[in-house]
UniProtKB/Swiss-Prot annotation:
Purpose of the protein: Hydrolyzes carbapenems such as imipenem, which are extended-spectrum beta-lactam antibiotics.
Keyword annotations: Antibiotic resistance, Disulfide bond, Hydrolase, Signal
One example of a Gene Ontology biological process annotation: response to antibiotic
Signal peptide: 1-27
Gene3D superfamilies, per database record: DD-peptidase/beta-lactamase superfamily (3.40.710.10)
NCBIfam families in the record: bla_class_A, blaIMI, classA_carba
Family to which the UniProt record says this protein belongs: Belongs to the class-A beta-lactamase family.
Location of the active site: S71
Annotated SUPFAM superfamilies: beta-lactamase/transpeptidase-like (SSF56601)
Species in which this protein is naturally found: Enterobacter cloacae
Protein name (record): Imipenem-hydrolyzing beta-lactamase
EC numbers on record: 3.5.2.6
Disulfide cysteine pairs (residue numbers): C70-C240
Length: 292
């Protein structure tokens, strides 16, 4: 091969790479602009992190900024219970008894079964799928070691950003600038990937965790609303009830494609502001479009 031919082929290859890089850069910039416009209309902050686990392509916006967790930590609480079962420290079939004084506002499942108690496994599922506050605080207190124990569990899986400082319902203040009970969209997404798709949980516990996520009842208007109806979604939402603060994170299983990990967090500066599910759904749609 002559030197000129070789140089020409190298030049063509280099040009092709530049074109590809330019294409993806333009697509990503377009997505960022869309999120910025959405954020302006929302009049608050939006944090997004999305990952295609097949291609490795990601999309992010304010992904390393802190946002209030609200109830979204309960998805990781359920995983901590499964890890405890896997390590033979906890028994999912153990019946947990309690009285109504143990139950906070919004405890629909634990209230229903207050007379006979619930299994620990069912209680963990209730915390995730129904955001049951009674189940959450009972599990935190008796089996996890409180907020400090929950934070310690997240450190054990490599998450250095998550912090839980308070119990339900106190953790829902969502005061701007308050780092208590916060994490970042990127850290949340990566921890979800680790727990739902990684090797921290055994195949049996991981299958249970995915089933619990898929059975969540609180997210129909958020990430689930941003994807085609034949895609499977497993998610956990959070809503603080103050400063328009709400969030959602999910594993999304598209048809004929590797799973996606999506994390969307939103908050405002006005205490009485209402959260907006449609903003979470739209931010998720934009992120997913930019993973193609």
């Amino acid at each position: 091969m002559s030197l000129n031919v070789k140089q020409s082929r190298i030049a063509i290859l280099f040009s092709s790479c530049l074109i590809s890089i330019s294409f993806f850069s333009q697509a990503n910039t377009k997505g960022i602009d869309e999120i910025k416009n959405l954020e302006t209309d929302f009049n608050g902050r939006i944090g997004v992190y999305a990952l295609d686990t097949g291609s490795g392509k990601s999309f992010s916006y304010r992904a390393n900024e802190r946002f209030p967790l609200c109830s979204s930590f309960k998805g990781f609480l359920a995983a901590a219970v499964l890890k405890g079962s896997q390590d033979n420290r906890l028994n999912l079939n153990q019946i947990v008894n309690y009285n109504t004084r143990s139950l906070e506002f919004h405890s629909p499942i634990t209230t229903k079964y207050k007379d006979n108690g619930m299994s620990l496994g069912d209680m963990a599922a209730a915390a995730l799928q129904y955001s049951d506050n009674g189940a959450t605080n009972i599990i935190l207190e008796r089996y996890i070691g409180g907020p400090e124990g929950m934070t310690k569990f997240m450190r054990s899986i490599g998450d250095e950003d998550f912090r839980l400082d308070r119990w339900e319902l106190d953790l829902n203040t969502a005061i701007p600038g308050d780092e208590r009970d916060t994490s970042t969209p990127a850290a949340v997404a990566k921890s979800l990937k680790t727990l739902a798709l990684g090797n921290i949980l055994s195949e049996h516990e991981k299958e249970t965790y995915q089933t619990w996520l898929k059975g969540n009842t609180t997210g129909a208007a958020r990430i689930r609303a941003s994807v085609p109806s034949d895609w499977v979604v497993g998610d956990k939402t959070g809503s603080c009830g103050a400063y328009g603060t709400a969030n959602d994170y999910a594993v999304v299983w598209p048809k004929n494609r590797a799973p996606l990990i999506i994390s969307v967090y939103t908050t405002k500066n006005e205490k009485e502001a209402k959260h907006e599910d449609k903003v979470i759904a739209e931010a998720s749609r934009i992120a997913i479009d930019n993973l193609k």
